[in-house]
Curated annotation (Swiss-Prot):
Its EC number is 6.3.5.2. The keyword Nucleotide-binding applies. Keywords: ATP-binding, Glutamine amidotransferase, GMP biosynthesis, Ligase, Nucleotide-binding, Purine biosynthesis. GO terms for cellular component: cytosol. One of its GO terms (molecular function) is GMP synthase activity. Homodimer. It holds the Pfam family NAD_synthase. This is GMP synthase [glutamine-hydrolyzing]. Pathway: Purine metabolism; GMP biosynthesis; GMP from XMP (L-Gln route): step 1/1. It comes from Burkholderia lata (strain ATCC 17760 / DSM 23089 / LMG 22485 / NCIMB 9086 / R18194 / 383). The gene is guaA. The lineage of its organism: Bacteria, Pseudomonadati, Pseudomonadota, Betaproteobacteria, Burkholderiales.
Length: 539
């Protein structure tokens, strides 16, 4: 059994980041609502508990409290932001509204030599005080320490920015160590779970394969499983893992809706039929999808049509596999958390994969979700450990509706063919161009990024087809052809994103190649919009 950290969620938008930081320390953790029962907390048997932040106020909402069992277990507890405030209130301290609210960067001084912060600092003051650059987001503040607690940190606007009762292993910080803006945040969380809680760092994907395979075999027995294979990371890793466990009991259904990337179908079939020797049913439904999309320009309408048609095609194929008793999905942990499907009595809604909707109920199948405890980065690690090629596992995200939402307006086969080729050229240039010392000196990347490909230095990159024509000149003749926009962003969470400052030479090569190699496009532009105000995808 793995040591476990229990994260109680009070409604913060960044609670998942806490879990990711704990998992990065190779310690297993789960997120659950703050109002779980005392029995649940005891049965979970955590090695430590972390209390998340919240948008709420501790003295206005008296319902948002940690279960009493948290304080009765005798295990270390870390409170973050609101978690610090509810710890203070529940253990006899005082919280009040602050006249000087803090939102953004702050420089915080550590006091005393507590185990949590000792030796962790970003710089020293002239007086020799250790300082940390942290990210604050709070209106309330702890005004009076609970009995047994000592001051651990402060800022000019927040005299009690950290507190600790080291005898009981209780620590609390007003800042957010889980966000990347707090430079030493990962180190702080790692110290809490490894040194203070003493959790074993044995949550490693290579080792997880054996556990997952055993669990799948126990669940499925000798029954058959079907899985909708999209070519995306989640479904591909799920397919590889299930095939490792049950072999020919798995049948993958790969639906080509005519809106895939260049050679994507061949890559998927070569991998799963050729290398893994899995059973794959390949359905070319491009005529059906494109026919229903004819004349449709509204983005949401296009998404609904593509989703509906996928369900129809998949259902028809699934009904041919009469022996199948299970439907496998590539559901991952963020899907479960966001849908309220964590493992408590509140788990009433399990989010279905965007491609299969309510198919488990329609087909009378049981649901198999072997990745539901994993974050995306863990899924990628697992894929590599299973032998999937890195170029498949570390591909940029691709929307479920495919090129259907990267072709503005009406979707036509002609437009999809043009976009496929333009997109492939852009991605090829990103993969083949590495960051240089000159790029780093120009501020386009960090010094540590020199030598990495620009594909790896961007979080998502693609081409967009614009259904407008512009005048151009090629050779001695006038052209009147379509426009494509290139889009590349950098982000840590996809909730916000910066446009990628790519080298001009790279953009120039991509533009020249697209215009010369893709007949029908004569103008290329680069999208320099951030998120917000723009979204990453155009539709």
């Amino acid at each position: 059994m793995h040591d476990k950290i229990l994260i109680l969620d009070f409604g913060s938008q960044v609670t998942q980041l806490i879990a990711r930081r704990v998992r990065e320390a190779h310690v297993y953790c789960e997120i659950h609502p703050n109002d779980v029962s005392d029995d649940f907390v005891r049965e979970f048997a955590p090695k430590a508990v972390i209390l998340s932040g919240s948008h709420a106020s501790t003295y206005e909402d008296h319902q948002l409290r940690a279960p009493q069992a948290v304080w009765d277990l005798g295990v270390p507890v870390l409170g973050i932001c609101y978690g610090m405030q509810t710890m203070a209130v529940q253990l006899g301290g005082k919280v009040e509204w602050s006249d000087h609210r803090e939102f953004g960067y702050a420089e915080m001084r550590a006091h005393g030599h507590t185990r949590l912060l000792d030796g962790i600092e970003d710089f020293k003051t002239d007086e020799g005080h250790g300082m940390l650059k942290v990210w604050m987001s709070h209106g309330d503040k702890v005004a009076e320490l609970p009995p047994g607690f000592a001051l651990m940190a402060s800022t000019p606007s927040c005299p009690i920015a950290g507190m600790a009762d080291e005898a009981r292993g209780y620590y609390a910080v007003q800042f957010h160590p889980e966000v990347t803006h707090t430079l030493k945040g990962r180190q702080i969380i790692e110290r809490f779970v490894l040194q203070i809680a003493g959790a074993k760092p044995d949550w490693i994907m290579k080792n997880h394969i054996e556990e997952a395979v055993a669990k799948i075999r126990e669940q499925v027995g000798d029954e058959e499983v079907i899985l909708g294979l999209s070519g995306g990371v989640d479904s591909s890793v799920a397919a590889a893992l299930i095939h490792r466990a049950i072999g020919d009991q798995l049948t993958c259904v790969f639906v080509d809706h005519g809106l895939l990337r260049l050679n994507e179908g061949k890559m998927v079939l070569d991998m799963f039929e050729g290398r893994l020797h899995a059973k794959v049913v390949h359905v070319d439904a491009s005529e059906q999808f494109l026919g229903h999309l004819a004349g449709v320009t509204d983005p949401e309408a296009k998404r609904k049509i593509i989703g509906r048609e996928f369900v129809e095609v998949f259902q028809a194929e699934a009904q041919k596999l009469s022996k199948a008793k299970w439907l496998a999905q590539g559901t991952i942990y963020p899907d479960v958390v966001e849908s309220g499907g964590t493992k408590t009595k509140k788990a009433t809604t399990i989010k279905s994969h965007h491609n299969v909707g309510g198919l488990p109920e329609t087909l009378g199948l049981k649901l198999l979700e072997p990745l539901r405890d994993l974050f995306k980065d863990e899924v990628r690690e697992l894929g590599v450990a299973l032998g999937l090629p890195p170029e498949m596992v570390y591909r940029h995200p691709f929307p479920g509706p495919g090129l259907g939402v990267r072709i503005l307006g009406e979707v036509k086969r002609e437009f999809a063919d043009l976009l496929r080729r333009a997109d492939a050229i852009f991605i090829e240039e990103l993969r083949n161009t590495t960051a240089t010392a000159h790029d780093a000196a120009a501020g386009l990347c960090g010094e540590a990024d020199v030598g990495k490909s620009w594909y790896d230095l961007t979080s998502q990159a693609f081409a967009v087809f614009l259904p407008v024509k512009s005048v151009g000149v090629m050779g001695d003749g006038r052209t009147y052809d379509y426009v494509t926009s290139l889009r590349a962003v950098q982000t840590t969470d996809f909730m916000t994103a910066h446009w990628a400052h790519l080298p001009y030479a790279l953009l120039g090569r991509a533009s020249n190649r697209i215009i010369n190699e893709v007949r029908g496009i004569n103008r290329v532009v680069y999208d320099i919009s951030g998120k917000p105000p723009a979204t990453i995808e155009w539709e």
